[in-house]
Amino acid sequence: MNLHEYQAKELLRVAGVPIPPGEIATTPEQAEAIAKKLGTAVMVKAQVHAGGRGKAGGVKFCPTPEAAKEKATAILGMTIKDLTVEKVLVTVAADIASEAYVGIIVDRATKKPVFMVSAAGGIDIEEVAATTPEKILYHPVDTRYGLLPFEAMRMGFFLYQDVKLARQAAKIMQQLYTAFMSAGCSIAEINPLVVTPQNELIAVDGKMVIDDNELDRLPQIAALRDESSEAPSEVDARNANLTFIKLDGNVGCVVNGAGLAMATMDLVKYYGGDPANFLDIGGSSNPEKVVNALRIITADPNVKCILFNIFGGITRTDDVANGIVTATKANPLKVPIVIRLTGTNEELALQILKENGFSASSDMDSAVQRAVELATKGGAA
């Protein structure tokens, strides 16, 4: 679950991280009033779950309250990566002497949180990792002990030679770690961490991604979800208990099991196609899941072909076949469908599909190739 910048900053503030004052506005008049209240130059920042807000025109410097109103008028209602901006953060504009990056991710190999720190802040850390990896220090944290003071100081001195700044940075890293753990994050970052002309550190921007598996035990964090800033298809899928991530391709994928779903997407790319989504119907033998999956995928106008890839274990292939038949009878497909299934009750599934005008294959490679071919032709058989 993604948090907005203002939500992430509030969690950081509670943990003790120094944050510029700011408030949320949903109208230009509110933005102007907040700027007057802050009494200094401000930044007006679009609050949507999308990167590249600045490049899209969603982050503006405003020297006066009148400018804040003007920029908020332009930003509110604008679309950034298919998401409509409904609120802006009006925050004090920081004087910047230098910028650094401090972040924490989860390393799935070591099963530990890992700090990433770099003096090259203010830009995407992925870009730094690709072009100048020596500028990044990685530091895993043993969760039995947490981030120890000497570890934090080591990272602080990696960023700053000045002892005062290194100590400030070390303290902020410990506070960031506290926020990361208490909110159930998979990602938490401050970018940039700014040195002001007064030689003080302040977190100008913050990002947090919450592990969905943590939400049941953290209802106060789950309450921060903003479905209006999520893709409608992902909200629909979550309500239908489907694991779904929307992508930009044209091959709609319906698969059971996360591993097979990722392998299917890899094969689609291998054969020259682009997957339109990641969709895992899970191990349930519930035809309704297939009905919901088809409904969600067919709502995407970019999808030119639908690919089913089912390996029947716990999932019975005849239930999947019945789901396909039920869904297509209720809403006839406007794009071709390619079905690959094998495993539990395979013969019965093939019979059900054949009786209803569908053909299916047990070979994954040929099915994926056919789906890519059809999608490339724009859905024409």
UniProtKB/Swiss-Prot annotation:
Q: Does the keyword Acetylation apply?
A: no
Q: Which cofactor does it need?
A: Mg(2+)
InterPro entries from the entry? ATP-grasp (IPR011761), ATP-grasp_succ-CoA_synth-type (IPR013650), ATP_grasp_subdomain_1 (IPR013815), Succ-CoA_synthase_bsu_CS (IPR017866), SUCC_ACL_C (IPR005811), Succ_CoA_ligase-like_bsu (IPR005809), Succinyl-CoA_synth-like (IPR016102)
Which pathway or pathways does this protein act in?
Carbohydrate metabolism; tricarboxylic acid cycle; succinate from succinyl-CoA (ligase route): step 1/1
According to the UniProt entry, what is the EC number of this protein?
6.2.1.5
Q: Which family does it belong to?
A: Belongs to the succinate/malate CoA ligase beta subunit family.
Q: What is this protein called?
A: Succinate--CoA ligase [ADP-forming] subunit beta
Q: Which organism is it from?
A: Gemmatimonas aurantiaca (strain DSM 14586 / JCM 11422 / NBRC 100505 / T-27)
Origin organism lineage: Bacteria, Pseudomonadati, Gemmatimonadota, Gemmatimonadia, Gemmatimonadales
